Amino acid sequence: MVITGGKHPTLMDMGQCRLSMGIVPLRREEVPPYTRILADSDMDGLFGAAVLKAFRPEATVMFSHAAALRGGLDDEHIDRNTVLVDLPFHPSCGWYVDHHLTNRPDQQEAAAFAAGGGTQHWESTPSAARLAYELLAEITEMEHLTPMMPVVDALDSGGISKETFLEDGPLLQLSRTCTSRDPVYMQHLVDLLAGGADFEALMADPVVSERCQRVKDERAAVQRHVEANTIIVDRLAVCRMDESGFRSNGYLVTAWAGDRADACCIVHGYADGDLSDADRPPLSASFYANSFLPGGQGRYDLSRMATALDSTGGGHVNACGCRVQPPGLDANMEHWLDMWANRETVLKI
C-alpha cells in the first residue's frame, strides 16, 4: 500500500472507498466554531489540520507536539475558538478531535468540558485525520485528499507492510519531512493540502520535492545509526538515538530487528535538552510494537510503560511515548526493562 512514481492504482482504488466506521458526518451548522487549528506536527496532524482548514480556510494553523502541550507551552494559544487535532486533551479548547487511547477525556472531564461549551469527538479511528475527514466529508471538498488518506491511516496505526516500508514511497518520505522544528515548512504543506493540491501537485512542489529527496538521502545514515546503536534485550529492541540529532519511528528499528523483537524502545533527545527548544528537546522514549510480525500488534499495552513514570506520557497501546524522568535514563530504562521482563502479567492485553 504505497504511492510510487506516477501510477498508484491500488491506493487510488482504496482511497475512493469511504471507510465505514459508524461516524456520523456533521451538518454544516453542527460544526463547532473555530478560528485556530492546533495540530500535532506529524503526518496525521498535518492531514487533520488540512481537513479542518479545507472546511474553514480563514482559520489559522499552528503545529505542536504532545509533550509541549502537556507541558503548558501552548496554553496561550488554546481557547474556545481553538480546535485540537491529534494532540492530548486540553479543557480550554472549543473542539477536541482525537483517537489516542490515553488522550481520551474521562467521564468527569468530558462532562465538565461539555458543560463549559466544548465539543468532543473521540473515536478509535486509524488516524485523527481520518476522524476529521469523516466528520466533514459531506460538507467539504476533499476529493484531492481521498487517495492519500489510506497511507495516513496506515502510518499512524501500524498498518504499513515491511515491503511498503522498504520501498519507501513518496508519502512515506513526506511523513519524515513533517517536524515541529520547521513551522514555516509545515505551514507550506498545510496550505498546499487545504488549498486543493492532490498527490501529483504536492510531490511536484519544489519545496516538498527537495525535502523528500533530503530525507530519502538521510535514511541510509539513520539506518547505519540504528544498526550500530541498537541492542535486543529479551525480544525488546532498544535503540539509542539520544545525543545524535537523529529521529525515527518504530518502523525502521523493527524492520532491522526482524523476528528477533516483539517491540522496540527508541530513546531520543538530549540530556541537557529543553522542551521549548525544538532543535534540542529533552530525553524521551518511544515504544512501538513490531507491526511487521504476524499478530505483532495488540499483544501488549505498551502505553503502560509510557505512563509508568511520566504522568504526561501516553499514546496508543502499540505506539506511545514519554519523557525521561528523574533520576535519569538509566533508572528509567531499568524500570521499563523490568516491566518488559514481566510483560505476560504487567503488559498483556
Task: Identify the function of each model-found stretch.
Residues 162-221:
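Accessory alpha-helical/coil subdomains and C-terminal extensions
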